[in-house]
């Protein structure tokens, strides 16, 4: 068993991400027997009181297989048409397979806007909570039929992490075609070393990410590490393990290889959980070392500590706060739009009113609207 990982039955709520390459064979379509073995594991955990949420890729891959489309990249509208065709087949298969074990399922299709906009986020969370209360197994996917490049997650690793943080899951399982994190790509370099335990995702860990993509999957190791950072920021543990074997959840409990990412400290409230999980900040505030120390001690970010600003944002948008080396220190909701922020950056709080012409907040990002990232630099 991966270092730090408990038996799955000891977790109260688990999100499981299933990759396209595991679920869909490009020649034959759905891997029905493999899926049945996974659902058998899910049913076993469900019977023991563990709440399971499935984040399933595969709609586009299944659709293009059903249409017998040739290899190669698809146009956006072609991908969306494949998703429309594949999603209905995928939902039916999940429903039929879960029903064999006496379980019901509910389909949830999300776009990025559904988790980044607060009201929609709360509504999605409430709906999924009711499904769980009814004893159903939610099956969640990105709504590929309508999502454009501007409002898409881009991969289901990040979607799964966002769902895990939104739902307060104890554990996120990424079932992949690789059994964990390596120092290098094991497919290309035989000297690659396996890493069983990751205390925090540092810059050195991120350098190990394999950015390779396949036609059936939009993800790679980089997106899995992105998912790990999202999960970590909300106090959710994560494991990356191979899903190629039958009964992949039982395999985890048997001790098959996987990389375990320790959970970070949970945010103090639901508001900060929502902020911490934002995937695409609208802008970046670069701050000096004095401001870094102030944030670490629990203070708000003042304009005086800001040395550079990037992006386009309005008041209330999410921004990333980075040090002068570009390392993200925190994420929060900014008190000013881009133009006003540029005018007051580097200035003392008592100067802001005279610069802007009205009485304004002294904090560019208030501590109540901010979540610190993990600042350690050792794995």
From Swiss-Prot:
Keyword Hydrolase belongs to the record: no
Keyword Kinase (UniProt)? yes
The catalytic activity, as recorded, is: L-glutamate + ATP = L-glutamyl 5-phosphate + ADP
The molecular function terms in GO held by this entry are: ATP binding; glutamate 5-kinase activity; RNA binding
- Key words, A-Z: Amino-acid biosynthesis, ATP-binding, Cytoplasm, Kinase, Nucleotide-binding, Proline biosynthesis, Transferase
- GO cellular-component terms in the record? cytosol
A Pfam family (short name) is: AA_kinase
Please state the protein's primary subcellular location.
cytoplasm
Q: What class of enzyme is it?
A: transferase
Q: Name one GO biological process term.
A: L-proline biosynthetic process
Q: What is its EC number?
A: 2.7.2.11
The PUA domain extends over: 282-359
Q: Where does substrate bind?
A: 57, 144, 156
State which pathway it belongs to: Amino-acid biosynthesis; L-proline biosynthesis; L-glutamate 5-semialdehyde from L-glutamate: step 1/2
Give the location in the cell.
Cytoplasm
What is known about what this protein does? Answer: Catalyzes the transfer of a phosphate group to glutamate to form L-glutamate 5-phosphate.
Family membership: Belongs to the glutamate 5-kinase family.
Q: Can you name this protein?
A: Glutamate 5-kinase
């Amino acid at each position: 068993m991966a270092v730090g990982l408990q038996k799955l039955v000891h977790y109260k709520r688990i999100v499981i991400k299933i990759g396209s390459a595991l679920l869909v064979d490009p020649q034959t379509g759905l891997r029905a027997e493999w899926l049945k073995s996974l659902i058998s594991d899910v049913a076993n955990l469900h019977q023991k009181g563990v709440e399971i949420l499935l984040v399933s890729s595969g709609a586009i891959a299944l659709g293009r297989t059903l249409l017998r489309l040739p290899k190669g990249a698809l146009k956006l509208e072609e991908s969306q048409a494949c998703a429309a065709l594949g999603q209905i087949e995928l939902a039916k298969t999940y429903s039929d397979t879960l029903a064999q074990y006496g379980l019901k399922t509910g389909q949830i299709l999300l776009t990025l806007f559904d988790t980044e906009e607060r009201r929609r986020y709360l509504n999605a969370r409430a709906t999924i909570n009711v499904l769980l209360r009814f004893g159903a197994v939610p099956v969640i996917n990105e709504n590929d039929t309508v999502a454009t490049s501007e409002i898409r997650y881009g991969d289901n690793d990040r979607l799964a992490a966002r769902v895990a943080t939104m739902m307060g899951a104890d554990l996120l399982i990424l079932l992949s075609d690789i059994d964990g994190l390596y120092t290098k790509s094991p497919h290309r370099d035989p000297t690659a070393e396996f890493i069983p335990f990751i205390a925090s995702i540092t810059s050195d860990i991120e350098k190990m990410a394999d950015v390779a993509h396949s036609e059936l999957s939009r993800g790679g190791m980089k997106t899995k590490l992105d998912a790990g950072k999202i999960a970590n920021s909300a106090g959710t543990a994560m494991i990356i393990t191979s899903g190629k074997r039958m009964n992949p959840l039982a395999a985890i409990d048997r001790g098959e290889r996987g990389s375990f990412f320790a959970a970070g400290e949970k945010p103090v409230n639901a508001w900060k959980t929502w902020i911490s999980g934002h995937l695409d900040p609208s802008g970046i505030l670069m701050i000096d070392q004095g401001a870094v120390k102030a944030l670490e001690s629990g203070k708000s970010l003042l304009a005086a500590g800001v040395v550079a600003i990037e992006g386009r944002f309005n008041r209330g948008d999410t921004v990333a706060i980075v040090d002068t080396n570009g390392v993200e220190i925190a994420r929060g909701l900014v008190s000013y739009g881009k133009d006003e922020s540029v005018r007051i950056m580097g200035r003392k709080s008592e100067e802001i009113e005279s610069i802007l012409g009205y009485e304004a907040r002294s904090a560019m990002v208030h501590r109540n609207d901010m979540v610190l990232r993990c600042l350690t630099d050792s794995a």
